[in-house]
């Protein structure tokens, strides 16, 4: 979760990712967003349960506080280990860095939809929108998925 969040944040932020004050909070927020998708679906499937329950689809807020803490430590370590902006340049040349994140969004988003967990589904759709915005697929999504023609680049390569 953490590495994918970090990488997605780098791509979505573009040149703004050069600032650690922008990059790090964005990555931490994306980790939290992914857990807001994962945990409700996992609880619905019975993969895990919390004795005290929780107001967010059976998940206590303390779980998310723990994710914020662990994400903060992990993201800072990634930033140091990957030399922050040096990774951004490498990421721009590799089209397939986020393939497993696509699977994550589809799988856990679909499970949330099946259990009528609408808020986690909305977060999954937002993450999916972020993935679409990065345009990191080995096929033209706009040509493959009906209704997404608006994603096609304009003349000159710009997206709408």
How would you label these PLM feature ranges?
Residues 1-160:
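Aromatic-rich, lipid-facing transmembrane alpha helices and their immediate juxtamembrane interface loops
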């Amino acid at each position: 979760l953490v590495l994918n969040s970090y990488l997605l944040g780098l791509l979505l932020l573009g040149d703004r990712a050069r600032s650690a004050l922008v990059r790090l909070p964005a990555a931490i927020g994306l980790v939290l967003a992914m857990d807001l998708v994962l945990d409700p679906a996992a609880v619905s499937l019975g993969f895990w349960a919390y004795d005290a329950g929780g107001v967010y689809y059976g998940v206590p807020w303390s779980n998310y506080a723990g994710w914020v803490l662990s994400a903060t430590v992990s993201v800072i370590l990634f930033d140091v280990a990957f030399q922050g902006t040096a990774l951004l340049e490498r990421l721009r040349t590799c089209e397939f860095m986020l393939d497993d994140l696509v699977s994550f969004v589809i799988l856990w988003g679909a499970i949330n939809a099946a259990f009528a967990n609408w808020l986690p589904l909305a977060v999954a759709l937002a993450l999916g929108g972020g993935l679409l915005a990065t345009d990191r697929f080995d096929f033209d999504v706009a040509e493959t998925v009906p209704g997404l023609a608006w994603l096609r680049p304009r003349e000159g390569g710009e997206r709408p």
